[in-house]
A protein has these predicted regions:
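Donor/substrate-binding cores of folate-linked one-carbon enzymes
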Residues: 22, 32, 81-200
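An anion-binding loop in the catalytic cleft
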Residues: 213-306
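A residue-level signal for conserved active-site and pocket-lining positions in enzyme catalytic cores
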Residues: 7, 29, 52, 82, ...
Length: 306
């Protein structure tokens, strides 16, 4: 089957590698434009572009698919199927209808749950026990197409979104490769989504990463896991200093006021409900450190307020 691949970040690059390894015919790759990266703003190619060029596949990087005759260019490439993984551009109807088998998308949630750009993170933020991957026949809506295949994935209660994303990527690449032969054979039954059960997973921001020590310990624990590695959950101390928390654990409390230091080895703080051990933190303007070192730097003792 002649495939045109569309994708941009690491998850898409891993899926593209899997397609090459499975022997699929990738006629072309579409990805986003190179972007300046880092302090020196070095122009850097998307991961997908690097993989495609390493395999000698033509790469296209249009600003949008809605103008400039890109639909005609895609038709000229004559793909039988378009595979989309985190591309970052809306596909117009003219592109959706171009291939014989249409366009499919790998979405890293169990649709219709968590439609949008950050499904893995929101599964962790909400303390879910499981998530999954879905292969969807694309339509003009946002993650609203019929589901062709899916697989559930258990979430470890201490797992960060970054750790989960690595596992989800591997499962997604495998399920994608397993689904393609069935698409070509016409043996898959597309299941319409239960749109009334849909939820969204909006993009994360640094502002929404804030939590308060008056929140419950479970909420803080999930927030820290879900915001790791980016943007990093944070709170403001009683002294007005911003502290990013990269790892914590839920601990017991005995009714102390939120923010009260219960212990310093490890640094344990009472919350609105329960308590948390702050294991790894990044104080504002400083390097990462363990919670005990942070407490020592502030000369905190049990009974103090953080």
């Amino acid at each position: 089957m002649r495939i045109l691949f569309m994708g941009t970040p690491d998850i898409a690059a891993d899926c593209l590698k899997a397609l090459y390894e499975a022997g699929h015919d990738i006629c072309a790759v579409y990805t986003r434009r190179d972007k300046p990266v880092g302090r020196k703003q070095v122009l850097t190619a998307p991961p997908v572009k690097e993989v495609a060029l390493a395999h000698g596949t033509p790469v296209f990087q249009p600003r949008t698919l809605r103008d400039g005759g890109e639909d005609e260019n895609i038709r000229a490439l004559a793909p039988e199927l378009i595979v989309v993984v985190a591309y970052g551009c809306i596909l117009p109807r003219s592109v959706l209808e171009a291939p014989k088998y249409g366009c499919i998308n790998l979405h890293v949630s169990l649709l219709p749950k968590y439609r949008g750009s950050a499904p893995v993170q929101w599964a962790v933020l909400n303390g879910d026990a499981e998530t999954g991957v879905s292969i969807m026949q694309m339509d003009e809506g946002l993650d609203t197409g019929d589901v062709l295949a899916c697989e559930k994935i258990a979430i470890d209660p201490e797992e960060t979104s970054g750790q989960l994303f690595d596992r989800v990527t591997a499962v997604g690449a495998r399920v994608l490769c397993e689904t393609l032969p069935a698409i070509a054979a016409g043996t898959l039954k597309a299941e319409p989504q239960a749109h009334e059960n849909a939820s969204t997973a909006p993009m994360l921001s640094k502002e929404m990463a804030e939590f308060k020590l008056t929140d419950s310990a479970d909420h803080i624990h999930n927030w820290v896991r879900g915001m790791n590695p980016w943007p990093g959950a944070w709170f403001v101390t009683a002294g007005g200093k911003k502290v990013k928390v990269m790892e914590c654990r839920v601990a017991e409390s005995h009714g102390e006021a939120a923010g009260t230091v219960l212990a310093t080895k490890p640094l344990t703080v009472a919350c609105g409900e329960g308590a948390v051990q702050l294991l790894h933190v990044v104080p504002e303007g400083k390097k990462p450190m363990d919670g005990t070192s942070f407490a020592a730097g502030l000369r905190l003792k049990a009974g103090n307020s953080l």
